[in-house]
Amino acid sequence: MAEDCVDHAITLGRLHDEPCPTRNLRIHGYLQDSSALCELDVYGSDAAEIRALAKNPKLAMQLHPALPYIAAEVVWAARNEMARTVEDILARRTRALFLNAAAASTMAEPVAKPLAAELGYDAAWVTAQVNDFQVLAQQYRVV
């Protein structure tokens, strides 16, 4: 898509055309073989780190039976993607809120607990995060 945009700009601006220098650039997350992907492989080369975290049985726990996310993804997002709230995880990291608001609503506490442990927050923070997310999730539920 970016190459199409640049090609169009070259045409419109009557600029000198050169071969795309990034055509074979391997960006972060690159996988050599993506033919047999599983759920965590959306993380590309980072999936191995999440699988390593999931060796801890508490982090291998699926957050909801209707969605494929596990607690290790919460910890990984806090450590590597600056996720800081339940909303960060369930809306922007996993998109669970948009895929299934009812399921995401029940995932709030199972997400808040490992996130709080990772970030050093207390039970009051967990409660506040769960309550805040419940209010938000209500707006996404199909009536």
Language-model features: where?
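C-terminal accessory subdomains/tails of enzymes that are appended
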Residues: 2-143
